[in-house]
Amino acid sequence: ASDVDGRYRGTDLHVHQLKEDEGLHYTVFSLWDTFRSLHPLLSWIEPGRTRDFVRTMLRMYKEGGQLPVWELAANYTGCMIGYHSVPVISDAKAWRIKGFDEELALKAMVQAADSAHLGLDVYAEMGYIPSERESEGTSKTLEYCYDDACIAQFASNLGNSEADAIAERFRLRALSWRNILHPESHFIQPKRSGAWARDFDPTEVNFNYTEANGWQYTFFAPHDISGLMALTEGKSSFSTLVENQFTAPSLTSGRDQPDITGLIGQYAHGNEPSHHVAYLQAYTGNHWRTQELVDEILNTLYTSEPDGLCGNEDCGQMSAWYVLSSIGLYPV
């Protein structure tokens, strides 16, 4: 977004000037998509670019008052869910990428997580977002939990008592996803205030989930896979649940959702919530099954034709999944 002379439009919609040592300023942060594969890949192969991404995010916080969620041309947009600048910043520190203000980064991340909008207030109070209180509350609960885990990891590596207290607070809050895993069905299900929503159908696309259904969001606790396996009665039962997603009929109910494409059973590779699921079989000891599933996705859902992607490229996420999977890696 910065011009050749270092000028850029900030999220306060004023023009600012970069200093010579401040790198580049970026735009188009499709973070709900790209935090999963693209940014982890770039942290590995382009650490200097990731440093500038983080610097850009922190400038957006200073100039506009909050970290980007889905920023476009200096506009916040309010599109999609989560506060997924957080995993990008946390991953940068995990890779020991230097050149950004870590104390400011922690302050910005905590501000994002402690905001009172988009169900965050009730999430902090109740440990989940009741379906009657907020649209897409089930998905928001899960993604807030993951982002909280990333805050905890970042803070725990700062090495001071104040950051340690922040790390512990968010480590505990990151486990809140367990409040919406049904103990009998083993699905992540919508929950009202104090009671499970009735007539749950894991194939139904509705207002409780973000561009997905119960099948596609049940496996989103990447920071707590061991807990997910334990609450679904262990590795064998969990392995069966994952397998059933890939062998279930490829039919959805509820509203029409054009983003749910590239189906193998109820696994939807054309949209991001499913992207890590094939790799979960490795956690159950069935590495061979992960290999089979990843190979099937690579060879059936990507081609070199003009329509060679089974879904939206989403600013590099679909291609980054292919690159990482082609070399046998994935950042669950």
Could you describe each region identified by the protein language model?
Residues 1-26, 277, 311:
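Beta-sandwich/jelly-roll carbohydrate-recognition scaffolds of carbohydrate-active enzymes
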Residues 24-36, 45, 86, 96-332:
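Active-site core of glycosidic bond-cleaving carbohydrate-active enzymes
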Residues 28-29, 41, 45, 77-80:
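Short coil/turn segments at secondary-structure boundaries
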